[in-house]
């Protein structure tokens, strides 16, 4: 009995992973990680109040990003640096 339950759960898990992979392939998972996607997200977080680069905005060094953001050196965008406060 226990073996059949374990086998059933394993088969369901494999089917879930397979279905998820097929769905991601249909949608084009590379579109989520592309720099074009980051640039489109930049428009959402734009603010006219500050002269610094906002969250997910393009950068080349940490000083270009707003407070509490740091420039990521893989795709060169501003992301949270893990600090809190004002």
Swiss-Prot record:
Modified positions (Phenylalanine amide) in chain numbering: 84
Cleaved propeptide residues: 22-50
GO MF term (any one): toxin activity
Localization: Secreted
Pfam family, one: Toxin_12
SS bond list: 52-66, 59-71, 65-78
Keywords noted in UniProt: Amidation, Disulfide bond, Ion channel impairing toxin, Knottin, Secreted, Signal, Toxin, Voltage-gated sodium channel impairing toxin
Cellular component per GO, a single term: extracellular region
Keyword match Disulfide bond: yes
Tissue-by-tissue expression: Expressed by the venom gland.
Main location: secreted
Its biological purpose: Inhibits both peak current and fast inactivation of voltage-gated sodium channels (Nav) channels. Inhibits the inactivation of Nav on DRG neurons (EC(50)=1.77 uM) and peak current of cardiac myocytes (IC(50)=0.90 uM).
Family: Belongs to the neurotoxin 10 (Hwtx-1) family. 37 (Jztx-31) subfamily.
Domain commentary: The presence of a 'disulfide through disulfide knot' structurally defines this protein as a knottin.
Protein name: Mu-theraphotoxin-Cg2a 1
């Amino acid at each position: 009995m226990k073996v059949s339950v374990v086998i059933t759960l394993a088969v369901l898990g494999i089917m879930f992973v397979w279905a998820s992979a097929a769905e991601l392939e249909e949608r084009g998972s590379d579109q989520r990680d592309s720099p074009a996607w980051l640039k489109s997200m930049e428009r959402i977080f734009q603010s006219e109040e500050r002269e610094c680069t906002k969250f997910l905005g393009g950068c080349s060094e940490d000083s270009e990003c707003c407070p509490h953001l740091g420039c990521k050196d893989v795709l060169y965008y501003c992301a949270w640096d893990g600090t809190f406060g004002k």
